[in-house]
Amino acid sequence: MERKTFSQLPLGVSDFHKLRELGKIYVDKTGLLYDLITTFEKVFLARPRRFGKSLLVSTFESLFKYGTRDFKGLAIEKLWKDKTYKVIRLDFSNLKDFSTEEEFSFLLDEYFAILMAQNEITVSKEKSFGGFSSFMYWLGLQPSNSVVVLIDEYDAPLTVCMNNPGLFDFVRKKLSRLYASFKNYEGVIRFLFLTGITKFNKTSIFSELNTLTDISLSPRYGSLLGYTHEEVEEYFKNYLDRSAKALGIGSEQLLDRLVSQYDGFCFEETVREKVFAPWSLLSFFAEPERGFKNYWFESGGRPYALLEYLKSHALRHPEEYGNLKSIALSELTSSSDIKNLSDVALLTQAGYLTLKNIVGTTAYVSYPNEEVKTSMAQL
């Protein structure tokens, strides 16, 4: 019985249909999703790695593609009345294995050719220009308000070449064509959602898609990803009890230690809502007898390309970032040019630093918790 109960952790499951089908625990955020979808049509959300962005994209995909099939018992089940749509899901984490302009062009065409085949998208031979261009041509032919576009890790191919300005600019220009098509054919798109880590400037996302709403620091959606203290106690009570028993400590002492180790991430500008790193918390619950390990940083919070860029530009002494740092709030709310990228802004968007306070137009940031603090000291 215990084995069955504790197999319900959603650790490593980023497919919403699979999560629901297997009976994994799902912290119900669908009330927020409904609010988001019915308020905005084009949305951007920046969050660190391992915070559930891919699961969120998968949740949108299931809702728009299959309606409430996978949402039985969740808040949105009784609220959702919309029809189903053609859903195009783009995962740009598949566009990272390149080191030259030619390799990226080939990778991009190949990716979109596979995407079109998987989605049974065809164009006439005389209009077939390679996967990338053919997809944009197809999009322009679709009926009004008929397509949902979801982009996961939009910035992945850009992050790979942050240390190569020429290649970065080439990739930026290539992807700009795609984002420009979303602007040109916006009447076709019912809902557009982009997610990533960093808000790069001059990628035609934030300049051409001027109707794109950035909710990254919105107080309303500060807990959209990550677990609040209340959610942990409600959805993971059995795991809290089991973990306290495994470590031989009281439940209150356990919660205090979990807060210190894995909580403290703040993604909204009132600085009131704090959330746990979900990957760290779930990993701890899976093996509490191992103690309070540094799960987030080792599993995905340490992207090689990002750290290499920081080390070559500003991140000489990671321990210095343990002190409270000040930064203009506009550096977090506005998109960044790669040539003038602030190390503090980049570290904050990547999750190494988090909001501690905002006074006027100045944000104060520092390490969110002990896990990040100790991991950064080991760089």
Residue ranges, per PLM feature:
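Phosphate-binding site recognition
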Residues: M1-L379
